Curated annotation (Swiss-Prot):
<keyword id="KW-0687">Ribonucleoprotein</keyword>
<protein>
    <recommendedName>
        <fullName>Small ribosomal subunit protein uS2m</fullName>
    </recommendedName>
</protein>
<dbReference type="InterPro" id="IPR018130">
    <property type="entry name" value="Ribosomal_uS2_CS"/>
</dbReference>
<dbReference type="InterPro" id="IPR023591">
    <property type="entry name" value="Ribosomal_uS2_flav_dom_sf"/>
</dbReference>
<dbReference type="GO" id="GO:0005763">
    <property type="term" value="C:mitochondrial small ribosomal subunit"/>
</dbReference>
<keyword id="KW-0496">Mitochondrion</keyword>
<dbReference type="GO" id="GO:0003735">
    <property type="term" value="F:structural constituent of ribosome"/>
</dbReference>
<dbReference type="InterPro" id="IPR005706">
    <property type="entry name" value="Ribosomal_uS2_bac/mit/plastid"/>
</dbReference>
<dbReference type="Pfam" id="PF00318">
    <property type="entry name" value="Ribosomal_S2"/>
</dbReference>
<dbReference type="GO" id="GO:0006412">
    <property type="term" value="P:translation"/>
</dbReference>
<dbReference type="InterPro" id="IPR001865">
    <property type="entry name" value="Ribosomal_uS2"/>
</dbReference>
<comment type="similarity">
    <text>Belongs to the universal ribosomal protein uS2 family.</text>
</comment>
<keyword id="KW-0689">Ribosomal protein</keyword>
Amino acid sequence: MFNRIHITVNQLVASDLFLGYHIANWNPRTNFFLIGKYKNTNIFNLNYTYFLAKKFIVFLSELFVNKGHLWLVNENFSLFNRSSELYQLYSLFPEITFLNSKWCKGMLSNYKYVSIVKPAKFPHSIFVPNIQNNHYVINESFIINIPSIAIVDSIDNPSNVFFPIPGNSKSLKSLFFFYMVIAKSLFYSRYITSSKFIFNSINRLNGLNSKLYRNLFVRDYFAFFKKRFLLENIIFLFKSGFFSKKKFNFLFRPKMHITSKTLLFKWKMPLLILSSVFKNVLHWDIFNKIVLKKRLVVKNLQFFKTLMFVLI
């Protein structure tokens, strides 16, 4: 499967995924994922986390390429209040539904008969960042054979989870890391679908005698569709109204001076989202053209652009 999302063990360490619960609170079923203890705290073996996280990326990319639907379920209100800006990004994409309210029992197993307002699409997969607060979701998805993906901490029971990922489920950093992986895999799945015909056309290039010409042909088409993919997704963000929300009104106010204080304290999390999604792939000439078309005047645009890359 073609995938351009790369993660490293250093990113897992920076996200505090190696930390577990106190040694007094642990589940023997997670003993396989533990490497030891340090200061009465269980420590996860990041080799398993790294291997399963890469499989998680491939699974997500295949899910989105085949037009699947994903539910993000989180009942941990403490994490939701601290990271509420994260979830505004997922309201833009029809492939993802985020559920942050209290889980109604029978939402999956009795989907037809639940009388509350339900999401429009039934899920093909479910992502649960914390099993302790969402064990009803895991049990219902296990009953009706929907693949569930969950971050399994040292106190959790991974027996009913279809795709367990060992790690720290009580940290905001680990939650932010996995949500950024989901956002990146969604963007790259759109890139895969837009350039699918390239892989079909490679088999038709056997008539070319030289391998050099064949490689140049494929490389040029990849570059062309990479620019097209970026342009389509950036225009999608503008059309969907993501930049027209209150926290992004500074982009639409003419000749407004942007200071470091307003960016770092009011719009830090949305800038982190955009910078992580478009890092190393965003061409600022395309961004500037869209800004000029929308007649957006930002006085300190260079500071805004550098901050997007420096924050992560």
